[in-house]
Amino acid sequence: MSIPVDYGTMTEIQMQPDEVEYITGCIKAMGPEGKMVEWGSGGSTVKWLETMTDQQKLVTIEHSPDWQMKVSGYINTRSDINDRFTYIFKPELYGYQHGYSNINEEHPHGLDDYLVPNKNILDADIFLVDGVARATTALLMKFLSTKEDPIIFIHDYYGRERWYSWAMQFFSKSEKVGHTLVRLWK
């Protein structure tokens, strides 16, 4: 199930309502200058920005030129949320195509600058991993994040547990949120 929206060419948030509600609750609980980092973008990106206060920030890291154009094209028309947003576009390198909804998307090859594009992202309060190489990205945030215990999510975890199970052993705790989202603790 997705959530219908009217965000230009984006007509849905590809998450369950209870997952969006949980994440927006976490955003509201961040400090007044809180930061969220997400890998992968879409209608949910706009929802996170609409939920944030003026001083909170969202950094989005995207590898897909199509999604980058859709999301940035829409957000650039919204002066009320644009100042909260930093978009980092890091396309796949070396000709590797990760694809969608198949195990190939989990391979970190060609994502040299995508996984950790700069160290400024490491102080976030929330990390939402919803792009490619999700297990690798979540694990890097566990070890590299500068906060004592940030919120780390992997979207679409449930239903693809075998893709991510190798990384789960390194987290102290995990909790199912909604239908497909998992929250992880350092």
Residue map of PLM features:
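Glycine-rich phosphate-binding "P-loop"
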Residues: 1-17, 25-29, 93-116
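Long, low-complexity, Lys/Arg-enriched
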Residues: 2-9, 13-17, 69-72, 165-176
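SAM cofactor-binding core of SAM-dependent methyltransferases
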Residues: 13-97
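Intrinsically disordered, low-complexity segments enriched in small/polar residues
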Residues: 29-32, 40, 108, 129, ...
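Short, charged, surface-exposed secondary-structure boundary motifs
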Residues: 67-74, 96-99, 161-167, 183-186
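Internal catalytic-core helix/loop-beta-alpha segment
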Residues: 85-140
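C-terminal substrate-binding/active-site "lid" region of AdoMet-derived donor-dependent transferases
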Residues: 118-121, 126-186
